[in-house]
Amino acid sequence: MTDKYAVFGNPIAQSKSPFIHTEFAKQTQQDLSYEAILAPVDQFDSSLVAFFADGGKGANVTAPFKEQAFSMCDELSEMAKLAGSVNTLFNLPYGKIGGDNTDGVGLVNDLEMLFGSLKGKRVLLVGAGGAARGCILPILQHNVAQLIICNRTHEKAEQLQTLFNEYGNFFAKPIEELISPFDLVINSTSAGLSGQLIALPSVIVDETTDCYDMTYSQQTTVFNQWAQAQNARKTADGLGMLVGQAAKSFSLWRGITPDTGSVMRKLRESLAQEAID
């Protein structure tokens, strides 16, 4: 019998998750289906419960439901508890729901594949929303020398410092106090999707700095355009993070780790074709 999986979001038509997980299933010979489900904003909980009641084995969750999914879980991983949100759900016995957050694992795996080991690096994390919170612990666990977080609203960054400072060398700094280059700058904000960019001092990037945008698009993202203008060493978008977090979800569900490289290549080709069309 084919096992059922899905991703819930609103909007959801743009989701690459069905393609990614279908490709993973093909390469690992797993008998499963994976669909995108548009959940009404005020009916996510009932949509998820109905999916699991109908035999769904597991689900991914994207905006705007990650925090709501967190609150519905009966069992949570330590990563999910600290992230305060989940993107991966499990249908447990007796009608219970389990939750995990694989975003941070997807990010750090992509960062180290692109830029080398994080160990000993000075890292700046731009933004203090849910995307940032889900990635702080995995970054600190990779033995960075220092992780600085900045945000338009400094108080939000300070709240995350209080939550995570026991896990490593982690500090919140006002944007105006950023006065020297970092080894790695990560943009966790989605402002670039609407053509916006947080005003960052150019001094944080030089020719030795790698820059990473958690968002992705057919063209170079607004943040990466800015980074390239500051002569950054390398820039990359978040497509690898997307595939990486999906691979971690898949391995948690199926007990097998898929190859991400071939799926990344197909997605890049698809995005390039969309840009032409």
Curated annotation (Swiss-Prot):
Pfam family, one: Shikimate_dh_N
A single GO BP: aromatic amino acid family biosynthetic process
InterPro entries from the UniProt entry: Aminoacid_DH-like_N_sf (IPR046346), NAD(P)-bd_dom_sf (IPR036291), SDH_C (IPR041121), Shikimate_DH (IPR011342), Shikimate_DH-bd_N (IPR013708), Shikimate_DH_fam (IPR022893), Shikm_DH/Glu-tRNA_Rdtase (IPR006151)
Record flagged with keyword Oxidoreductase: yes
One Gene Ontology term of the molecular function aspect: shikimate 3-dehydrogenase (NADP+) activity
UniProt EC number: 1.1.1.25
Pathway: Metabolic intermediate biosynthesis; chorismate biosynthesis; chorismate from D-erythrose 4-phosphate and phosphoenolpyruvate: step 4/7
Keywords associated with the record: Amino-acid biosynthesis, Aromatic amino acid biosynthesis, NADP, Oxidoreductase
GO CC list: cytosol
Annotated binding of shikimate, by residue: 15-17, 62, 87, 103
Domain of life: Bacteria
Catalytic activity: shikimate + NADP(+) = 3-dehydroshikimate + NADPH + H(+)
Record: residues binding NADP(+): 78, 127-131, 151-156, 238
Residues at the catalytic site: 66
Assembly mode: Homodimer.
PANTHER family according to UniProt: BIFUNCTIONAL 3-DEHYDROQUINATE DEHYDRATASE_SHIKIMATE DEHYDROGENASE, CHLOROPLASTIC (PTHR21089:SF1), SHIKIMATE DEHYDROGENASE (PTHR21089)
Family membership: Belongs to the shikimate dehydrogenase family.
Its biological purpose: Involved in the biosynthesis of the chorismate, which leads to the biosynthesis of aromatic amino acids. Catalyzes the reversible NADPH linked reduction of 3-dehydroshikimate (DHSA) to yield shikimate (SA).
Protein name, per record: Shikimate dehydrogenase (NADP(+))
Species this chain originates from: Shewanella frigidimarina (strain NCIMB 400)
